[in-house]
Amino acid sequence: MDMASESVGGKILFATDDFFAPAENLIKSDSPCFKEHEYTEFGKWMDGWETRRKRIPGHDWCVLRLGIQGVIRGFDVDVSYFTGDYAPRVSIQAANLEEDKLPEIPERGTRTGAAATPEEFEAIAELKSDDWSYLVPMTELKPGNPASGHNYFLVNSQQRWTHIRLNIFPDGGIARLRVFGTGQKDWTATDPKEPADLVAIAFGGVCVGFSNAKFGHPNNIIGVGGAKSMADGWETARRLDRPPILENDENGILLVPGCEWAVFRLAHPGVITRIEIDTKYFEGNAPDSCKVDGCILTTQEEEAVIRQKWILPAHKWKPLLPVTKLSPNQSHLFDSLTLELQDVITHARLTIVPDGGVSRLRLRGFPSSICLLRPREKPMLKFSVSFKANP
């Protein structure tokens, strides 16, 4: 997962120089491209961040806020198409900053042809980014040819990071900066009165098993924000065991032998009080019905069932949402009718029948550390359901 991408909320806060191409290009979600004959009033158009040839002391650098904050596993410094003008050396620093203590950073606006102003330097200096931890020391880069354009760096750190400083020495161009890792929420800052999405990928939720992902991975459905298209969801192949002629049961649910499923490890153990299943964009290929179950697994148990391809005794799974009819291109909200809490779970399984696509899954509730502080009575599994039309 690219934690810095603009598609998940990554943002450039500052760059020393953006003369040929702005730093915002670094965090585009698409791959860089090259337009041989395209120029701007400042020079050759390049799909990346490119600074002017430096003629003053120092080096160029930029600061970005991660869209998904958490543990960084590695970087890809992509200099594709920068062959005679790539940055020859790079280093990367990081910090874990509290959002409410950040100084006010001026909005960047249109940057091509410009350098940072004294006011912008003064504002960014309050972050003391010179002192941030080094995740990648100064390292030489390879040119942006097809065989050498991607420069990969592994990171051995378990710390949570919120901001990145990318240093280039002394100047030049970089096409993309990919920051790979896993989300990690600061649960100590969670409002105990407000439910959180315990499966969100931004907080550390992750898919740990699935039956089929022909047209889209289940990790997509726990992504940041709403789905952008059908490609931004989980979609399976059509099951081949469907009967030649389909029939419904007395509740209008299709009578079919097969199903597809995906299992998610929650970002934090907790109880689920609100479920949202969104089939936006899936109009001719939404599932007929679904159900959601939960269980508690230790790390060792999870590793074992992954090896067994999620063959888990049925009694381990506890129902969170019974078999429920779904509608195409629709957001389905399921609210508990009671204030009593359900059992704490670590994993959730979404089952769809017989096949099809889902754009988003939200499992809102309370992390277990907060649940223990709340009164607990006999759990109930009654749900109310509402539908929210997608535009």
UniProtKB/Swiss-Prot annotation:
One of its GO terms (biological process) is allantoin catabolic process. GO terms for molecular function: allantoicase activity. HAMAP family: Allantoicase. The function of this enzyme is unclear as allantoicase activity is not known to exist in mammals. Belongs to the allantoicase family. PANTHER family: ALLANTOICASE, INACTIVE ALLANTOICASE-RELATED. This is Probable inactive allantoicase. It comes from Homo sapiens. The gene is ALLC.
